[in-house]
Each structure stands twice: as structure tokens, then as C-alpha cells.
Curated annotation (Swiss-Prot):
GO terms for cellular component: plasma membrane
Residues in compartment: Extracellular: 64-76, 136-156
Entry keywords, A to Z: Cell membrane, Glycoprotein, Membrane, Transmembrane, Transmembrane helix
Cytoplasmic side: 1-42, 98-114, 178-188
Protein's name in the database: CASP-like protein 4B3
TM stretches of this protein: 43-63, 77-97, 115-135, 157-177
Length: 188
């Protein structure tokens, strides 16, 4: 039995008189809790990868007719949104590979825990802001065109923008977890 520095009660003592739950967690429970943010970030990055891929595919195939107003490549806003989706897809792919390697081997591809935390946080921030920038550039064009006519081209553009927004949400939530991990590294 060990004693807590803040109190004179032992760590293994029950939390309440009639309870059998220990006041502290076992090492295995702590390990599971420490790995929870890593697993959550991996899941969020997988969602970001999926939504970025879908946004890329939907926007790149948004060609209805032969050029002119029914082709996404004639609108620079859509090209920008497509470019940001490509960047998000590449980033999410790299981070998924890195996180999977980290979970499977226990070692990170980036040397140093603090450097890895900074890379995670900065990368998530840059990609999240890039995605929101791309979709906020494309959304007004789609809204304006949908007011004039509602067709498959506009619906596909709106779907691609929505998927890019979901990718943004996943990466921005991953940035919150990365920020939490960075703050823990700054304390240590």
C-alpha cells in the first residue's frame, strides 16, 4: 500500500465505506485511458481521409456537359476546393500511416515526443484551416448558381463542399486532441 502525498489515505483504500471500487486505477486501466486520445485521433483521421477522398472524387467528377458552365474546372473556387481536398487527403494518409505505425510498434516515425506533438498540432491546424478556406470559397458560388437553377452540377458541387466540411470537422477535432497532447508534452 502506498500513500498519497495530499492525504493520509492509502491509494488502495475503497472510495466509500461500502464500495469495493479502489480510489486509484490500475496500471492497465491508466494505459487504456492514455491510449484513448491516440485511438480517437486515429479514428478521426480515418474519417478525415474518407471524407477528403469522397470530396475529391465528387468534385473531380463534377463535369456535366462539354465544358462551359457545367464543368468544375471553369470555376477557380472549385479548383481551390479540390486542391485543398487533395492536400487533406495526402495529409490524412500520411498521418494514418504514422499513427498506425505508432500504435503497432510503439515507436513514432518523428524523432522526439515533443517534435511529434508539434508536427501533429501544426499539421492539423494548417490542413483544417486550408479545408475551411477551400470550402468557404466554393460555397458562395454554389449558392449563387443554385438560386438561378437547381441541377445535377450544382448538387454535386454542394455534396463535395459538404464532404469537405465533414473532413474539416474530423481534422479540427483531431487538432483538439493534438493540442491536448501538445499541452501534456509542454508540462513534462
Amino acid at each position: 500500500m502506498s500513500f498519497s502525498p495530499a492525504s493520509s489515505e492509502p491509494h488502495d483504500a475503497p472510495a466509500a465505506a461500502g464500495s469495493s471500487v479502489p480510489a486509484s486505477r490500475s496500471i492497465a486501466e491508466r494505459w487504456k485511458m492514455e491510449a484513448a486520445p491516440i485511438r480517437a485521433r486515429l479514428l478521426l483521421r480515418a474519417f478525415a481521409w474518407l471524407f477528403s477522398l469522397l470530396a475529391l472524387v465528387v468534385m473531380a467528377t463534377d463535369v456535366h456537359g462539354r465544358g462551359g458552365a457545367q464543368d468544375f474546372s471553369t470555376y477557380p473556387e472549385y479548383n481551390y476546393c479540390l486542391g485543398m481536398s487533395i492536400i487533406a487527403l495526402l495529409y490524412a494518409t500520411a498521418q494514418l500511416v504514422r499513427d498506425a505505425h505508432r500504435l503497432s510498434s510503439g515507436r513514432d516515425l518523428v524523432a522526439g515526443r515533443k517534435a511529434a506533438a508539434v508536427v501533429d498540432f501544426a499539421g492539423d491546424q494548417v490542413v483544417a484551416y486550408s479545408l475551411i478556406s477551400g470550402l468557404s470559397a466554393a460555397a458562395p458560388v454554389t449558392d449563387y448558381m443554385r438560386q438561378a437553377t437547381d441541377n445535377l452540377f450544382n448538387d454535386s458541387a454542394a455534396a463535395a463542399i459538404s464532404l469537405a466540411f465533414f473532413a474539416f470537422l474530423a481534422i479540427s477535432l483531431s487538432a483538439l486532441i493534438s493540442g491536448y497532447n501538445l499541452s501534456l508534452e509542454a508540462i513534462v
